[in-house]
Amino acid sequence: YLINHLSAQMVHQFHAASAVLWTVLAIVQSWTIHHDRISLHRRTGMAIFLLFPLFLVAGVWVIHVEATTLATGLDSATGLSDSENVELAQFGFFDPLANLGYALMFWGGLKYRYKVHLHARYMLGTIMFVIAPIVWRLLRGYVPMIHDMPFSYPFALGNLTAIGIALFLYAQAPKHGRPFLLVAGIMAAQEVLFETLGRIPAWAPMFASVSDMNLPFLLILTGITSIGIAWHGWVVGARPGAPS
């Protein structure tokens, strides 16, 4: 009952809080390893097994809220003539890809946890999917000229900034840069799909139909899936002969 009746704003705040916690953990992990606090790095790293499912569940919850809001909008008199409804439909590609990219980076970080360069880059990749939303919110909030533009402009600038950062990091060490290429590719797909398939009128009701899914079941399924991803990444990354 509580899950189904939390406001959309509270769900977004829950998602934002989980993102902040994940980012703080990434900073702590970077600090501990750079100061040779390896034991502390390993102990605090165990928090990822709590925060990863939390963040993924929050992300899927936001997608369900967006689909529900879109379904309501499509039933209104304005429908797709309302730009907000069109944007919600477009996010039906952006947000799922962000969740998939985050999960892929997390899985890679566990799989390559004994290969320092790859492990660090995969784990850094998990937080790169928040760059574009931060940039476009700052642009819309603090740059008057951009504030008056259609949303697709700051959205594209945010994505291009994030892609540029990913490619810059790749160029610093191409030998170990595969995670950043993956991040850049996923972000490019987010931008392209947002501006192409996301604008097709037939897509809007398809995404809105996600709201028909039972929310508690969807969140439980996401939680189970996240545990499976973590378990698989941990097992495939185990050293030969070491207990998994």
Language model segments and positions:
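Alpha-helical membrane insertion/targeting regions
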Residues: 1-244
